[in-house]
Amino acid sequence: MASKKKELARFTAEIMDSAVDTIGGIRFTEPAVLAAYAQITAHGCTVEDLAVSDRAKKGVRPDEPWKGHAMANSISANIEGTILKVEFSVPDTRYGKILMVTADTVGGFDKIRFIPVGQGVPDKDGKVDAFKLSYVTFRSDLK
């Protein structure tokens, strides 16, 4: 008898033009939100674990993409003014870690990083929604 896959928790990330990285102080604009929305709805995106200690153990450089460690997938995306809301399914054993959203570069961005806010603990329905945008980076050829 095949074993069942682990239940997935879901969380919603809000990407806003007023979001500020508490470390770098980087802001982004409404066009970035629109580009991200177009990308996610057309191609989807995945979330990767960026735990530095795990990366070091696996010998992955900090600036190197960790392609084989996708841990979640986008379920839906909708835009409300300058706020992009993206819902992801994520294994419930992974909550509370630093996450990064990656997508194909067609939409004009490479990476969006989310950081846990508060405890990031799933509720009784398995939902984790205590994540917020940390920063977004753009492809250099779009300058």
Write out the residue ranges for each language-model feature.
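A glycine-rich, hydrophobic loop/mini-helix early in the fold
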Residues: 61-77
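Intrinsically disordered, low-complexity coil segments
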Residues: 55-64, 105-110
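Short, surface-exposed beta-strand/loop "edge" segments at domain boundaries and coil↔beta transitions
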Residues: 17-26, 53-60, 93-98
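A structural detector for beta-sheet-dominated domains
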Residues: 14-16, 48-55, 63, 78-80, ...
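Polar/acidic, low-complexity leader/linker segments enriched in S/T/G and N/D
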Residues: 1-51
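Short, flexible beta-strand-to-coil junctions
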Residues: 16-20, 51-54, 117-124
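Residue microenvironments linked to proteolytic maturation
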Residues: 73-143
